[in-house]
Amino acid sequence: MSPTPPRSKFPLPLDAVVQRKPAPARTAGMPAVGAPGPAQAQAKARDKQPSAPTAAASAVEARASAATAGGGGMASDRARGALAARLRASGIRDERVLAAIGTVPRHLFVEPGLASQAYEDAALPIGHQQTISKPSVVARMIELLREGLSADTPVERVLEIGTGCGYQAAVLSLVAREVFSIERIRPLHEQAKANLRPLRVPNLRLHYGDGMLGLPQAAPFSAIILAAAGMEVPQALLEQLAIGGRLIAPVAVVPPAGGSGQTVTQQLLLIERLNRHRFHRTALEAVFFVPLKSGTI
């Protein structure tokens, strides 16, 4: 990997961003797994405050156009809009999520040689044996985090485990007031910073560290999303989830001993924190993610 030029200090600033009018109300998503708790109540109480996602959307939309000017078909609004339309047709109903997918220029987060595939619903390699997730998976997981929120209410504070190239973090910044993202692979952390720099996302903080430990200094989080699959969800992350908050993660499914097949598969797991000691778990569809690992490299 070639040396990278000096970069501005991260985390990125949260202020000095011009706002625009709030996005149109989305249609209702899937029913909430449990009743809204304190995390959602806190979000509703702040509805009338300036919205960081709207500020981020203004910043990202304007800078995406500038960063991709003259870039041809893959740089056009039409390519992003067409992707959002396909996701809507496939079952994604959260208009806020669809608008975010239609705003973030995915081709800026992939290798130039793969730019022609950036707006296909496909996972693509980003180096270091990691991938950028399929847009449909990104949209589905974020939509699950937003269940139970009103149409114009952002998620309060999100923790992402596995920044990768930074694409999902950029999408999250348009649906949440604050986003904290952790990456354990130093070159990917630097790559994400470089990818996000042209967009100057105001409500996103990137951290280099062990994602399995979470980010206790910024906890609690109203939502946590994992971009890698472990045998189970790390206890540290459960402890950092706010009461009433949601965590979405791919987890391994090991077949019972003595069964006909011993292939380990993965499925999405939605966890809601009901109170200090109780969690509600819902197993969802099959997925395939890179493995969740501890430590930093």
Swiss-Prot record:
Tell me the segments the record calls region Disordered. Answer: 20-57
For this protein, the Enzyme Commission number is 2.1.1.77
CDD domains noted in UniProt = AdoMet_MTases
According to the UniProt record, which cysteines are disulfide-bonded? none
Q: Where does this one sit in the cell? A: Cytoplasm
Q: Which GO terms describe its cellular component?
A: cytoplasm
Please give the superkingdom of this protein's source: Bacteria
Q: Which UniProt keywords apply?
A: Cytoplasm, Methyltransferase, S-adenosyl-L-methionine, Transferase
Per the UniProt entry, what is one GO biological process?
protein repair
Q: Major place of localization?
A: cytoplasm
Q: Bias category Low complexity: which stretches?
A: 28-43
Reactions catalysed, semicolon-separated, are: [protein]-L-isoaspartate + S-adenosyl-L-methionine = [protein]-L-isoaspartate alpha-methyl ester + S-adenosyl-L-homocysteine
The family database entries (SUPFAM superfamilies) matched by this protein are listed as: S-adenosyl-L-methionine-dependent methyltransferases (SSF53335)
Name the Gene Ontology molecular function terms of this record: protein-L-isoaspartate (D-aspartate) O-methyltransferase activity
Q: Name one Pfam family in it.
A: PCMT
Active-site residues? Answer: S133
Q: Does the keyword Cytoplasm apply?
A: yes
Role summary: Catalyzes the methyl esterification of L-isoaspartyl residues in peptides and proteins that result from spontaneous decomposition of normal L-aspartyl and L-asparaginyl residues. It plays a role in the repair and/or degradation of damaged proteins.
What family name appears in the similarity comment? Belongs to the methyltransferase superfamily. L-isoaspartyl/D-aspartyl protein methyltransferase family.
PANTHER family associated with the record: PROTEIN-L-ISOASPARTATE O-METHYLTRANSFERASE, PROTEIN-L-ISOASPARTATE(D-ASPARTATE) O-METHYLTRANSFERASE
Q: What is the name listed in the Swiss-Prot or TrEMBL entry for this protein?
A: Protein-L-isoaspartate O-methyltransferase
Organism the protein comes from: Cupriavidus pinatubonensis (strain JMP 134 / LMG 1197) (Cupriavidus necator (strain JMP 134))
Give the source lineage, highest ranks first.
Bacteria, Pseudomonadati, Pseudomonadota, Betaproteobacteria, Burkholderiales
Q: Which gene codes for it? A: pcm
